Amino acid sequence: QCLESVQSWSREHNHTWRFIDDDLFDLVPGWYMDKTGKGPIAADYARLVLLKNALSSEEVDQVIWLDADIFVLDNAMQISSGKSCAFGQEVWVQEEQGVMKARKNIHNAVCLFKQQCVVLPFLIETVASIIKRADPDRIAPQMVGPKLLSALHSLYDFNLLPQVGAISQEVAADIQSGQGPALNL
């Protein structure tokens, strides 16, 4: 259903929709795959390379990435940016020390890059550099994705796309039950 919803949204906005499976990992250098394995850390790098390649080899003004587990609730949703790139923003709700907390985070489940974007090649180089120098036993799942983007956002002030968020387990459980502390924030 997720893929179908994104495909429908793409048609609604006259975007070209493409699905890429594990071939995505073919874009990741061998040394990187050896260090990280096939998973989110490798996908973070591959996504950037794929989008850069699409911008340089196709006649497009911009590219938009939506993760395979994104579900589009409203086909009228707009994804655009006044800057050369944009990333998702979510309000993540979870319990911390017995209290529900809501935090705004940046994520890369959705991202947009335009032609001539200087951030995209910088991100590719930075992600490779971080992984090259990282201790393989200390690579965190979001190290070169959301955590890196959040750190850079404090310096660069990316355009954010809050219309594409994520639902924590606490929020999902409260939605399912129709009530709960995660929905009261």
Language-model features: locations:
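GT-A fold catalytic core of metal-dependent nucleotide-sugar glycosyltransferases
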Residues: 40-95, 103
